[in-house]
UniProtKB/Swiss-Prot annotation:
Function: Catalyzes the covalent attachment of the prokaryotic ubiquitin-like protein modifier Pup to the proteasomal substrate proteins, thereby targeting them for proteasomal degradation. This tagging system is termed pupylation. The ligation reaction involves the side-chain carboxylate of the C-terminal glutamate of Pup and the side-chain amino group of a substrate lysine.
Pathway, per record: Protein degradation; proteasomal Pup-dependent pathway; Protein modification; protein pupylation
Gene name, Swiss-Prot/TrEMBL: pafA
Native organism taxonomy: Bacteria, Bacillati, Actinomycetota, Actinomycetes, Kitasatosporales
Source organism of this protein record: Streptomyces avermitilis (strain ATCC 31267 / DSM 46492 / JCM 5070 / NBRC 14893 / NCIMB 12804 / NRRL 8165 / MA-4680)
Extra remark beyond the main annotation: The reaction mechanism probably proceeds via the activation of Pup by phosphorylation of its C-terminal glutamate, which is then subject to nucleophilic attack by the substrate lysine, resulting in an isopeptide bond and the release of phosphate as a good leaving group.
EC identifiers of the protein: 6.3.1.19
Any single biological process term in GO: proteasomal protein catabolic process
Protein known as: Pup--protein ligase
Amino acid sequence: MDRRIFGLENEYGVTCTFRGQRRLSPDEVARYLFRRVVSWGRSSNVFLRNGARLYLDVGSHPEYATPECDNVTELVTHDKAGERILEGLLVDAERRLHEEGIAGDVYLFKNNTDSAGNSYGCHENYLVARHGEFSRLADILIPFLVTRQLLCGAGKVLQTPRGAVYCVSQRAEHIWEGVSSATTRSRPIINTRDEPHADAERYRRLHVIVGDSNMSETTMLLKVGATDLVLRMIEAGTVMRDLTLENPIRAIREVSHDITGRRKVRLASGREASALEVQREYYEKAVDFCERRGIRTGTVEQVLELWGRTLDAIEAEDLDRIGTEIDWVMKYKLIERYRAKHNMTMSHPRVAQIDLAYHDIHRRRGLYYLLEKRGQATRICNDLKIFEGKSVPPQTTRARLRGDFIRRAQEQRRDFTVDWVHLKLNDQAQRTVLCKDPFRSVDDRVEKLIAGM
């Protein structure tokens, strides 16, 4: 599939503290956060003018699902626009709290674990063709996804009985199955619940829930871009070496606990391979595939260059080569500098604080944004495009139809209901348009519905 629909869903951790002590329960904070949303949307589950969905997920986690995007750079921009929307809700919630005489700071963290050991996710969505064996797709993808954390892990200081260790991935400790239809109970690598949000005869939605949430724009680009290339190879019938893992769940933890990428994991064939070797296999196949097919877009070249350089840097133990582009490396360098300066062990509470503060989405507080201000975080988006993405949907996908419909209905103060595929006016006629093609950004039926308001 040369043109693919992508979507990202990020759940955010939330807390409110006063002088270091927890001030409100997550439920109470979430209520303040969403008060503005509920006042205009009459619900804590709404679709926005940019085509995205914003809602309160299980366990009081705000969740932002990007609109459908058909290129990876635009997807990263819309994910960042979601961060900005939530930052706006955070500032508004703090103001309301202070007006009511409740002192405290509200924090939203774009991470995947809280201090109690709970995990919440970043879910990636890739549209794939319905024909073809899904099990074959999953079999080839799983070794890639288990080792992909070397490219796009968010990094985590993990407290163990033997002391604290720095791990590549936050999510790795919380994955318990390879492929399953559950998302919370057993947490698989690939979720098989079949909800295509499109024509079910033609498409299915590959739902990957193993990845970490990313602060870095370049890490996000690499995560989705490399996965897209692997999918393209599978779809084209590229012959791949059998890298099936003997035990993917054990392997994902072993890979996460080794920042050198050299620890061997057992394959089902009885052989052993390191995460670097597995990734190198996929990377070299992808380079060859793109050369043979003449795939030469700027994004693909960017993805391949960063993919190769990341593997080279880890192999050479020269992390400075990717020190402004890969989340787990950026955070690791930040922690190591701080530890060296203050002569601290990895178990020190201040180190845990840095680990968390990296993911604070408040641009005046978060450590990732401090690095960005210092020019120590490479960017691929610009702030104007991100600002635009808060209210303007992607113009080349179904999101445009949804966004335009919502904008017009709100301007005309009309009651409406939307989801990923339906647009409905709640009037006497109950006019509804079903939009099954996510690639379609122009539709006479929708134009008519909008014109009739």
